[in-house]
């Protein structure tokens, strides 16, 4: 093996080491991104649950309001009709 071959092999070895280091850093970044996304998915599920509860409660309030309106209307109409 010539001196130039040794230099070339050393250069290739250094390049491979740099790429390995870069891949490790990218892997760590991907792990951090995965953790962040997992946390976001968890938060979205919590907000989705809260929103679902809010929507159900709102619908119940609307139903109660219409029930009260119907009851009060009947409370006025029935005595008026029966007294005639």
From Swiss-Prot:
Residues 3-34 form a coiled coil. GO terms for cellular component: plasma membrane-derived thylakoid membrane. Keywords: Coiled coil, Membrane, Thylakoid, Transmembrane, Transmembrane helix. It is found in: Cellular thylakoid membrane. The chain crosses the membrane at residues 61-81. It is a single-pass membrane protein. This is Thylakoid membrane protein ssr2422. It comes from Synechocystis sp. (strain ATCC 27184 / PCC 6803 / Kazusa). The lineage of its organism: Bacteria, Bacillati, Cyanobacteriota, Cyanophyceae, Synechococcales.
């Amino acid at each position: 093996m010539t001196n130039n071959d040794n230099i070339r092999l050393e250069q290739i070895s250094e390049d491979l080491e740099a790429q390995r280091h870069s891949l490790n850093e990218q892997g760590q970044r991907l792990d951090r991104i995965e953790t962040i996304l997992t946390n976001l998915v968890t938060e979205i599920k919590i907000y989705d649950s809260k929103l679902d509860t809010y929507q159900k409660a709102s619908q119940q309030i609307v139903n109660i309001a219409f029930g009260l309106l119907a009851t009060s209307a009947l409370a006025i109409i029935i005595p008026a009709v029966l007294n005639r």
